[in-house]
Amino acid sequence: MVLTPDDFNPTPGKAVALAPGLRRILAPNPSPMTYRGTNTYLLGTRDLAVIDPGPESDAHLQAILDACQPGQRISHIIVTHTHTDHSPLAAALARSTGAPVLAFGDAQAGRSDVMRRLANAGLAGGGEGIDHEFNPDRSLSDGEIIHGADWQLEVIHTPGHLGNHIALGWDKACFTADHVMGWASSLVSPPDGDLSDFMASCQRLRHRDWQVFHPGHGAPVLDPGGRLDWLIAHRLARERSILDELATSPATARTLARRIYTETSTPLLGAAERNVFAHLVDLTGKSMVAPDGDLRATATFRRLA
């Protein structure tokens, strides 16, 4: 992850208007992985869609409920993906409002074949926090249109950060959750994240004429195309760095991470190692590197091409 300093520092629990019919409430869960906290969005002026309720927090639940103005009700609860900083509060919010919970699926939904094989072989996640208890009231399909009284959202399946990750198109704006953010590059951590899927999802979003991205963490991204170009170039540069290192000698993901992520703080080195392994899985699939034996996080990889 590459951290980009900015002046984004809203008050947790306070609803901030971003555009007509759109407000954001920051959850009180800052961390090196969540930046200032999770962005919860309220869309609509009558029937409200809550996008990413956030982590379990009584204070955040109350802030969402308090943001409902006279004549408004929460009609939809939409979860972009099942990391524990985005989905767990959905159940309590549904109990409080009666609104259905919509998402692409449970924690396993959308997982690629190679990541399923890694998971079945015993590879555990890197501690990002998967909400294994999550089950939506209704599963969404790619391309589906969700209708509210005065809004509609297009479901765009964007696997990569997580197999069940979706973005939500709202006219020329897009809620990109953790796939595209301005403050950092997205974590891709096998067996839940797949870099091949991530790059394909970036290209898919790049082919659309967006004016603004509303991310899961951090400030709005005002140059969507430029940010996507940067993310794609950043990943390709990481790939070149890995291949250059492997041209010198075979190495593990851990060794490569410490050689390449020289400016990354210690708390984020574990995430860096998972990102490197994601690249190695992708490069293995492209027959550019090979592990010594089975594909696994601790394998030593050598360059083939």
Segments predicted by a language model, with ranges:
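C-terminal regulatory/interaction regions
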Residues: 4, 244-305
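Conserved beta-strand hairpin/beta-sheet module of binuclear metal-dependent hydrolase folds
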Residues: 8, 12-71, 167-182
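Residue-level signal for inorganic ion chemistry
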Residues: 21, 64, 217, 242, ...
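Active-site HxH/HxHxD metal-binding segment of metal-dependent hydrolases
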Residues: 36, 55-149
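Short active-site oxyanion
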Residues: 48-49, 74-78, 241
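Metallo-beta-lactamase
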Residues: 48-50, 55-57, 118-121, 126-137, ...
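Histidine-centered divalent metal-coordination motifs
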Residues: 80-86, 161, 217, 279
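Aromatic/hydrophobic pocket-lining residues that form the small-molecule binding cavity
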Residues: 87, 198, 202, 276
